[in-house]
Amino acid sequence: MSVTLHTNVGDIKVEVFCDATPRAAENFLGHCAAGTYNDVKWHRNIKSFMIQTGDPTGTGKGGQSIWGKPFADEIRSSLKFDRRGIVACANAGPDTNKSQFFITYAKQPHLDGKYTIIGKVIDGAEDGGTLDAMEAIPVDAKNRPTSEIRMTGVTVHANPIAIKAAGK
């Protein structure tokens, strides 16, 4: 299962871990399919660490899960922040996942066991790819990009949640 996040900087294709973290995957795919992420800013960008999005208000303080309330973490010991391009739920502490997510720019082992991993980048994390372009964008004192980065749309390549709902 994969989605392509289209941005004004380039595309990022993500493999979603539907079996390993089913609730987080359902929430992420639900937002992708509903257009929640369309025209949303990437509001936090920290070189060598990560870039964050998924807040429809663009402030980093908004967003909601598809169920209208935060959902529990799905921490899996088999999933680690062991490479560039790990996609995970952003949160404000344990069991506070909503619509926001982040993508790592490098290994971040200190995050292991603290954030639910949704998937990994399978296209766009290579040298000279979209993540490089995003990481190179200057930021202000609050790590907000000085040149706007926006999600222009999302392509869901095969949505098992929709297939299940359709009874197929």
Swiss-Prot record:
GO cellular component term, pick one: catalytic step 2 spliceosome
Domain of life: Eukaryota
Keyword Electron transport: no
Catalytic activity reported: [protein]-peptidylproline (omega=180) = [protein]-peptidylproline (omega=0)
Family: Belongs to the cyclophilin-type PPIase family. PPIL3 subfamily.
Enzyme nomenclature, EC number: 5.2.1.8
Domain PPIase cyclophilin-type stretches: 1-156
Role this protein plays: PPIases accelerate the folding of proteins. It catalyzes the cis-trans isomerization of proline imidic peptide bonds in oligopeptides.
Tagged with keyword Isomerase: yes
GO biological process terms on file: protein folding
Protein name stated in the entry: Peptidyl-prolyl cis-trans isomerase-like 3
Keywords: Isomerase, Rotamase
Organism per entry: Mycosarcoma maydis
EC primary class: isomerase
Family matches, as InterPro entries: Cyclophilin-like_dom_sf, Cyclophilin-type_PPIase, Cyclophilin-type_PPIase_dom, Cyclophilin_A-like
Molecular-function GO term, any one: peptidyl-prolyl cis-trans isomerase activity
